[in-house]
Amino acid sequence: MPFGRRVSGIVHGLALGGVLYSVMVVTFVIVLPVIWRPVWVRWVVRRAARVAIPIALAGARVRVRGTGVEYARELERGRGYILIANHASNLDPMALIKVLGRVDLAFVAKAETLRRPLLGHMLRACGWFGVERESPIAFKRFQEEVQARRKAGWIPNLVVFPEGTRSTDGQLQPFRMGTFLLAARCRLPILPVVIRGTSPIHGRNAFACYPGTVRVDVLPPIEPPGKLSAAEILDAVAALQKKAEAIYRAVPDLNRVDGDLPSPALAPSESVS
């Protein structure tokens, strides 16, 4: 890689991380000590993030283009949803927040991410959930928490990366079943979102960030199956997972932002039975 491009990547990486962390740290140090109610803390931190993320992306010269936001708006007014997206970069959550900035997104992350000293505290304050990936007990507790909070009036706008981790090359990895099991058991629609272009700009475990364009396409929702018996649910979940994964497999290259999404990515909303 040419020396000038390496320097550019470091400079823009500093701009991205520096702005984002500075705003969030100032929020924690100055504002949060005088606020004690968790709901107020979440409100302040989320709005600080919505201010910081566009500024950080602009400083790094990363443009985010979005389509299909109306699908999220419609579901937000009803029973909520589980937003799924492919995952290749730390830019992915920022791009989602930039496009869906008026939606209170609750990200579901690896539990170890929320145990990091400063970052984890910030993410928990934003309302993120941490789930142990390989623990059925932890997943069951998370499902019960979602259902209990829904009964109390909470409309879940959950964000899950069903690959379970970031891709090393930007291309799709196999989906895990847990996301779709949660959708079936909680009767929540799946909202597919295709993110393109983040890996070449800011790859996995990379500090450098290069100027470029990210595209976020929100697609029509997939309705969950109806009420099922214990014997039927696994087949229905497998069908839901297969349908969702086919949307992403239809995209020729997740590292390229040019062109519209092909069918079946743009198929109309339908239920899985």
Segments predicted by a language model, with ranges:
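Membrane-anchoring hydrophobic helices of lipid-metabolizing enzymes
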Residues: M1-Y81
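Short acidic-hydrophobic, aromatic-tinged amphipathic segments that line or gate anion-handling sites
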Residues: G66, F129-E132, P224
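A short acidic, often aromatic-flanked loop/helix-cap motif at beta-alpha or helix-coil junctions
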Residues: Y71-L75, R115, P136-K140, I222-L228
